[in-house]
Amino acid sequence: MAARLLAPPGPDSFKPFTPESLANIERRIAESKLKKPPKADGSHREDDEDSKPKPNSDLEAGKSLPFIYGDIPQGLVAVPLEDFDPYYLTQKTFVVLNRGKTLFRFSATPALYILSPFNLIRRIAIKILIHSVFSMIIMCTILTNCVFMTFSNPPDWSKNVEYTFTGIYTFESLVKIIARGFCIDGFTFLRDPWNWLDFSVIMMAYITEFVNLGNVSALRTFRVLRALKTISVIPGLKTIVGALIQSVKKLSDVMILTVFCLSVFALIGLQLFMGNLRNKCVVWPINFNESYLENGTKGFDWEEYINNKTNFYTVPGMLEPLLCGNSSDAGQCPEGYQCMKAGRNPNYGYTSFDTFSWAFLALFRLMTQDYWENLYQLTLRAAGKTYMIFFVLVIFVGSFYLVNLILAVVAMAYEEQNQATLEEAEQKEAEFKAMLEQLKKQQEEAQAAAMATSAGTVSEDAIEEEGEEGGGSPRSSSEISKLSSKSAKERRNRRKKRKQKELSEGEEKGDPEKVFKSESEDGMRRKAFRLPDNRIGRKFSIMNQSLLSIPGSPFLSRHNSKSSIFSFRGPGRFRDPGSENEFADDEHSTVEESEGRRDSLFIPIRARERRSSYSGYSGYSQGSRSSRIFPSLRRSVKRNSTVDCNGVVSLIGGPGSHIGGRLLPEATTEVEIKKKGPGSLLVSMDQLASYGRKDRINSIMSVVTNTLVEELEESQRKCPPCWYKFANTFLIWECHPYWIKLKEIVNLIVMDPFVDLAITICIVLNTLFMAMEHHPMTPQFEHVLAVGNLVFTGIFTAEMFLKLIAMDPYYYFQEGWNIFDGFIVSLSLMELSLADVEGLSVLRSFRLLRVFKLAKSWPTLNMLIKIIGNSVGALGNLTLVLAIIVFIFAVVGMQLFGKSYKECVCKINQDCELPRWHMHDFFHSFLIVFRVLCGEWIETMWDCMEVAGQAMCLIVFMMVMVIGNLVVLNLFLALLLSSFSADNLAATDDDGEMNNLQISVIRIKKGVAWTKLKVHAFMQAHFKQREADEVKPLDELYEKKANCIANHTGADIHRNGDFQKNGNGTTSGIGSSVEKYIIDEDHMSFINNPNLTVRVPIAVGESDFENLNTEDVSSESDPEGSKDKLDDTSSSEGSTIDIKPEVEEVPVEQPEEYLDPDACFTEGCVQRFKCCQVNIEEGLGKSWWILRKTCFLIVEHNWFETFIIFMILLSSGALAFEDIYIEQRKTIRTILEYADKVFTYIFILEMLLKWTAYGFVKFFTNAWCWLDFLIVAVSLVSLIANALGYSELGAIKSLRTLRALRPLRALSRFEGMRVVVNALVGAIPSIMNVLLVCLIFWLIFSIMGVNLFAGKYHYCFNETSEIRFEIEDVNNKTECEKLMEGNNTEIRWKNVKINFDNVGAGYLALLQVATFKGWMDIMYAAVDSRKPDEQPKYEDNIYMYIYFVIFIIFGSFFTLNLFIGVIIDNFNQQKKKFGGQDIFMTEEQKKYYNAMKKLGSKKPQKPIPRPLNKIQGIVFDFVTQQAFDIVIMMLICLNMVTMMVETDTQSKQMENILYWINLVFVIFFTCECVLKMFALRHYYFTIGWNIFDFVVVILSIVGMFLADIIEKYFVSPTLFRVIRLARIGRILRLIKGAKGIRTLLFALMMSLPALFNIGLLLFLVMFIFSIFGMSNFAYVKHEAGIDDMFNFETFGNSMICLFQITTSAGWDGLLLPILNRPPDCSLDKEHPGSGFKGDCGNPSVGIFFFVSYIIISFLIVVNMYIAIILENFSVATEESADPLSEDDFETFYEIWEKFDPDATQFIEYCKLADFADALEHPLRVPKPNTIELIAMDLPMVSGDRIHCLDILFAFTKRVLGDSGELDILRQQMEERFVASNPSKVSYEPITTTLRRKQEEVSAVVLQRAYRGHLARRGFICKKTTSNKLENGGTHREKKESTPSTASLPSYDSVTKPEKEKQQRAEEGRRERAKRQKEVRESKC
């Protein structure tokens, strides 16, 4: 493609399309038909497909014409032209271009069979169609039409408007049809799917107009699809819709799996809970005196009585009657009521398990977790608390697992799509550069010749070599990305090959992608201009070195960092002056070494425009432009790169950070950088460089090149030249010398880091001031706040004006932050002037945006804003699609259900008024759709089903749910996660340059240190001591600091004359003018000392110590710290040498028994207190030492640990008994008291033993020991308090609640949990960081909430009737208070408990909104609010909904998903540190995990022998056939179907039919069981599934006869049959199409160990919190979410409540009663059986309890689930993409068993051909296969047998080809084999199949020759008979005894001795390396 485009197309490309052109096309078509040879066979290979011509992607219809074609010649706009794309040379097409150069392609056949391309009418139609105004008109029409669709009651004249719209659409379609043709050829009207939409819309419009089709509103909804037309008009949207459709396709497997799982769970639910939810408390006994007898005429009507609502018990304040159950742990009825089935199900009868369909809906609701707490509570109340287990299963498997799988799939689809577009962009850029080169070449050649003579010609081969060598392009992110799938990778590789082939013609043998990556940005660094290093190098080395900063250190010269340009390393020999090679000696030059690791070459700088406040002043900043031009460069640099001033990127601690070779610099002079006044410019290389390296200008660069560079710059400027002129005149103020002087002074002040610090402090204070607003406020306080606001506004305004003076408006507004500041300041000033205008108080909220200024100096906030910015950019199109979807569904809902809501409103509301959630008008309809997208669909759907019928509502809501929620929101998440990658995270942290804030902090520290020193010195001087000694350390400190950073490894530093020598032997001196490097001999070699990192020395100017980061200094004393900083040094992706840790650092492990106890005290203690020093050789000391050793042995003993664990579990269990009934159970209470003491003593003893054994140092430096210590201390204190009788003290009571932490001690003992906790602790810093950022983010919304709603949530309420007063009766607080005076008990002026009266309360309210729990009440209160202290009015302030919508999108959506992003990202980083191991698993679990992953992990098993008995044998054959299995599976499925048919209300007849069908199934399964037992004999019980089947059959038979008894005491036996569905898993292997589902299940299996650990941790957290809840909230008043079953009174109830909140469901209900204060509760309420008084909660404790639990469980644990599933899913997908999967190996072994019935693991050679043919694809070698098998050269052992692994390996090799992977696979298989067969003697192979064949052939040849010889001798006749014998004999002998000395052929077998095998492997490796080297050299 590129090759084709390289020739500049020029104006002759534009040829008008004439009849001759058409004739030419026809001629070409005829020619190509003649040329085409007939196909040899039907098979086509992928390569052929690839080599076929494809349409050029740049010249697709709808794209802009590439600029290389230049401008369209006059008169050819909107005129048919010949096609540009060679692909269409043999197709009848032509193209037309409009003014915007957009390309339209048409079919050249006659449209509608009449209008040829040259017809006038058709040409006019084409002109209209391609005109931009035409599409604008259509777009406006669609938008206007959409507006009209939103009218719920359209006016009469709207009918005419409708006709107008239809007319316009018809005209549009006619134009398209005339221009394009209707449907016959390509590019006609109906060939574009988007036109189908138009066509159907128009047809529906006409049909509905002329034919009466009944329900018009349903058909009117069709018009809504017009909104979709916007997608076809806006280009970006089509791609997003493409991505959506792709992800839906990918979701098919997950959908199937989800439906299957839900069906299984629904069946279980059906069996368990059928009819239970109708249990109600009915008045009992019946009172017959009432009117039921109806005047004695009619008898008592039981049906009517049972269904009469007035007879049910309803809890006051609730709408639904109370449910109950008849089991002991279900809900009980109050006195006078009996529990029985009556009335309908809850929620209009829609929540039930009575039929399969309702059960399925209930389960779907559980999976999406919508209002599931309600279902959970109802079911537990009706069936019993034990059924919590069912919900745990469904939530963890269904909800967490399946929903996250959907996320994983969408994320993968998105990632792949992204990858493809990225590659395309890169390809485009490479082509663009190549074209530019071509265009410039002509102008250049003359000068090039002249230059070449003067500078020494550069030979062509050098250029070629350089093209090769410089090609270290960084790995594309697809290679790095885990989520890109196999097929995509293969496609990409093919594309790459093709691309390279095509481009090599245009380039001088250098891969253009590499050239692009490595050449300078303008593409104009001509090769002819490259000169040898020394020519330019000398000139610039001085300057460069002074500017070379230490990568990764804060020394980066800050003043110029922002204007640095994307400079690129030149590939190959001709490097930039001052680059690393300047210092490399000739032998070890960087490039020569870099051969082996291509990806470690230098790559372009990241275009991160983090400029400091100097940037504006330092000249026109160009960073932004470069990033615009080459967006892809941004991504090219991964996070561990650091940038020096030259723009050379070195990858610290990543690939290629250690450049090969000793880096020995020449002696070069350093120029000290003097600290310039900020006004003067510090000139750096970066500034000298404009686009190309302009340093060339100084030496050689010719004027021509210069002009070219400028030309390119010109072409890439945003604005017209006149704008720059204007800017220069008016926006850059340099009018007068005095003015300039003033500017410099102001600049000095404003740019000072201290001013930045002051401003930051002001921002924080201002935020605090705004956060202090509350309701009610005193006037004085309000006044203080107002004054504060004025002061801050003044400060910020002053800052802005001063900056404007210092920087000039032009430069001021170059920087994003300044624009932001200006915007906020203007708003603040505007707000001051409009302060008194009513309704503009919202403007105050804009002040809050100042908080974002903190981002300047807070990297995480900065990152968050960037991420949101990036995503919003990328999400723009997605958001539009989402908006269109929401709009369409809102209109559909309004059109379909609007009327029904109005007409049937009484069904859903007793007052017959429209409820808050309805679809009668567009706004409310929109709100419902938005609510569904938030995941709350079930409640609104019930309403809809009640008023508008079930079918339609279900369809519409399910569509919104699936399309909107699952797909779009998941795409959002995927986008967020992808923009949230390590790059963004690390880039902000170590961006190399420090912000002003850090500098000012360092200055302050420096000042404090200086003051201290002076004081110290002063004191010293007065005490007559030598001053000099004391001052010296400061210099030393400075030098150490500098060196520590320079060395970057924090090694020890010694003073060495003038030089400092670090632990690695490199030295760097500071302050000396000429530098030398002293390098020890043993450090010389890079190999000996892989730690050697050489940094270029730096001159230390005055300013540099400001940049010193104090943390870096600490690394001297902390080698660990420095290791962390070099975070993943060992990841040697690119480097040839891994960095080994220093030897000393690795402690030699000794066997644990012999370790002596550590020292008791720290060295400091021992020095200060001599008594701590003990001689352990004699006397008391010796006894003490013996005691310690004894204690050590005890503590280290396994039994001791087990005993302690047992005690911990017992003591934790004991806590669970301390519920509200403990005082009634005297014995238990006494036992617990004694047990508590015992436990305390045991734990104290344990602690004393550990102190003695380990010593204080070891004990108190271990975090887990601290935990133990604190918990024991709490127990001890409460024990002492009890003994002293202080147990009732408040403080002691609260201490006792801390005993709930006891189970935490189990953490350190259970490895599974400890692993997870360690991983979590590792993540805490980043989680905290994000939590803080979220809090800041929410602060803005909270303050805004306070501004909008403070004091407006109060209302006047009648406590007795529980009714709010209407606004007509009570208007405000004063009126309510008057009423209260008259009737003080009943009426109250109340506040909503969750409100916005202050920022703290606002946070709580926002948390409820963000978790969508309790958010309705908050929103209703907001929407009804009027003014502070006024009675609310229904929907008076309806647009306040929008505040919540915005908060949900930004506050909830972005920030909560950010948590997921951070956690996933963090664990991925931790995994990298642990070498890719899973950090959530213990060692044992890792083994299991690896076993799951390893291929070929099976070994041949001994099959069940076939019985000798004839009949048994026949049955055996029948039972072991696959068909038999499949039939049984089908029977199981049929049985399931019959179970689905069951309903709760079925008739007697139906019941009988089902009974008999069930009986038939039981007989079938019994027969299967009997047959199998008969055939398999005792082997039947060796298979797990058979045992399970046997148990199920027995239970079913027993169940048939004893059904009633079993049902009563156990679960129904039918339930076990549901479990048999698991057997379906066995069929999946047989279905080829089920590969995707197998992958998903495989992913689940792989996730299990890690998920189990997290589950364990979650259980522990729940346990601790439930104990805590019991001790704090046991006596809380029953209301809202707390009642007789769901409460904190007992341990079981607490666990039930906490499990519910794990998904954050219903936590608002549980919190509300705890927030009660009198008079809502009573402090004196008695509790019978307990001494406790009162039923009030403790609000602060309650809020802390719930919020912390939600953050821990919901955000952390649940998100860890997501992280693990995403991870394992990507691994599983990679594995399933392999050509050979686990299943292929399994089938191999299954077939093997038939050929090797005794499981000898060998097969005879003669059977090999049959075996190979019997295998399944891909391992199968179909017959005739003899020759192929012989060629495989398989080793054989005596007896002509071949080992299974050798065969498997050879066949695998045949599938995978010979590759490195194969060696790994082979090794794995051999390991497994040796591990599973330790007893096997190593069989020595004696020959191979190939050798055998060679022997046979040679034997035949020899025999023939010998025969001929004998014949010639005349012996032949006599010896015929004996010859035959001999022949047989020799043959047999040969078989039996091949001489051992025979040199064996070259084969490699499992059965070979180990040593020889290793040697061979080593040789093979050397051979391969040699080959690769040869290949590389041949390329050069």
UniProtKB/Swiss-Prot annotation:
Residues 28-61, 501-530, 586-602, 1951-1980 have a biased composition (Basic and acidic residues). Keywords: Cell junction, Cell membrane, Cell projection, Cytoplasmic vesicle, Disease variant, Disulfide bond, Epilepsy, Glycoprotein, Intellectual disability, Ion channel, Ion transport, Membrane, Phosphoprotein, Repeat, Sodium, Sodium channel, Sodium transport, Transmembrane, Transmembrane helix, Transport, Ubl conjugation, Voltage-gated channel. Changing residue 260 to S: In DEE13; uncertain significance. Changing residue 1872 to L: In DEE13; gain-of-function mutation; increased voltage-gated sodium channel activity; impaired channel inactivation. Changing residue 1323 to S: In DEE13; uncertain significance. Residues 1895-1924 form the IQ domain. The keyword Zinc does not apply. Residues 152-158, 212-217, 274-355, 381-387, 773-783, 838-839, 893-921, 943-955, 1218-1230, 1283-1290, 1347-1399, 1422-1438, 1542-1552, 1602-1614, 1669-1690, 1714-1742 are extracellular. InterPro entries: Ion_trans_dom (IPR005821), IQ_motif_EF-hand-BS (IPR000048), Na_channel_a8su (IPR008054), Na_channel_asu (IPR001696), Na_chnl_inactivation_gate (IPR044564), Na_trans_assoc_dom (IPR010526), Na_trans_cytopl (IPR024583), VGCC_Ca_Na (IPR043203). One of its GO terms (molecular function) is voltage-gated sodium channel activity. Changing residue 58 to N: In DEE13; uncertain significance; no effect on voltage-gated sodium channel activity. Changing residue 960 to D: In DEE13; uncertain significance. Glycans are attached at residues 215, 289, 295, 308, 326, 1358, 1372, 1383. It is found in: Cell membrane; Cell projection, Axon. III repeats lie at residues 1180-1495. May be ubiquitinated by NEDD4L; which would promote its endocytosis. Pfam families: Ion_trans (PF00520), IQ_SCN5A_C (PF24609), Na_trans_assoc (PF06512), Na_trans_cytopl (PF11933). It is linked to Cognitive impairment with or without cerebellar ataxia: A disorder characterized by markedly delayed cognitive and motor development, attention deficit disorder, and cerebellar ataxia. Features include bilateral esophoria, strabismatic amblyopia, unsustained gaze evoked nystagmus on horizontal gaze, ataxic gait, dysmetria in the upper limbs and dysarthria, with normal strength, tone, and reflexes. Belongs to the sodium channel (TC 1.A.1.10) family. Nav1.6/SCN8A subfamily. The voltage-sensitive sodium channel consists of an ion-conducting pore-forming alpha subunit regulated by one or more beta-1 (SCN1B), beta-2 (SCN2B), beta-3 (SCN3B) and/or beta-4 (SCN4B) subunits. Beta-1 (SCN1B) and beta-3 (SCN3B) are non-covalently associated with alpha, while beta-2 (SCN2B) and beta-4 (SCN4B) are covalently linked by disulfide bonds. Interacts with NEDD4 and NEDD4L. Interacts with FGF13. Interacts with FGF14, GBG3, GBB2 and SCN1B. Interacts with TMEM233. Interacts with the conotoxin GVIIJ. Interacts with the spider beta/delta-theraphotoxin-Pre1a. This is Sodium channel protein type 8 subunit alpha. It comes from Homo sapiens. The gene is SCN8A.
